[in-house]
Amino acid sequence: MTEGAGHRDGELPDDLTAAEAGMWQAFRNGSVYDLSSGDALVDDPHGGRAWGPERTVRARIVCWLLLDGPPALAGRVSSLQLVGVRISDTMDLAGGTVDPYVELRACRFDREVLLPETRFTTVRLVDCSVPRLEAARLQTEGDLHLPRCRFRSGIRLTDAQIGTDLLLNQAVVHRDRSGRSIAADGMTVGQDLQAEMLESHGEVSLRSAQVGVSLSLRGARLLNPYTRHALNAPQLTVERTLYMTPAGLGSPLLRGTTPAQGTRIQRFECEGGVRLDDGRFGDAVDFEHARFTFTDEQELSLRRVQTPELRFLGERPARGRVVLSGARVVNLMDRADSWPGPGRLHMG
């Protein structure tokens, strides 16, 4: 059978591999398609163990299912739910509209995932290995989940529109050729942006981004010794609170509460400058227990920031400056030992 012919009647295409045929049938049934072996070392998508043809599907077959797939079986709702699957070649859904629910767990992509101007309902990639996610102007009606994924060459979400929540908890993101780990200028998130215990190697760029509820960087590590900023987010708007505070190591993460005695915590750490100039925060900016590591030329810049409350309760930065020129803060919560030394605080 030629590609596309007869598939609307549910007939299985002739040229599918055994792994792809199983995925096709699971899609029609709306069931999870699990190709993991049961061996944790072998199944680690970020490990070095090879995954052979028995657990490999071609990206174009995945795209075929998502863009123009067969009908669901009677009484079922079609969906793509993969576990432990290797996806070969480039997954290119650029400009497409994807109606089925998509959830991939512990999967491995050989090449970048291309989603620019793609429309989804909800899409979840959990604990996946992805060379790069290219998703400028992506639109989702619901959530975009990327927790525990690892991206070797960055994420691009410029001008993306996320209908509800964006989750980046425990993701590891390395920089692209331009030095950015996450490029999300102009992005809009309808509800929460959670990047708790995110590990970023490069610049996180959120210029003019908008978050409908809170932005949580609890326990995150933003590391950018390469260029000026680890977080570059002028004109950022957060309707409630920006958290750069600790997270609990374990489940659930701390959410602004006092941890039980003996609970291990991971503080928010930033190596590189932070630029929040002209930001608008509806409830608070919270730096409790934050650790900033700057060079002499770098700074925590809060020029013209507007917030009802600033919780400046982090560690004193040994180098660099803190700049609050033109900031409008109603209530300041601070400690004397949180501010930088003489000559390194600028408020005029």
Positions of the model-derived regions?
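N-terminal leader/targeting and pre-domain segments
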Residues: 1-348
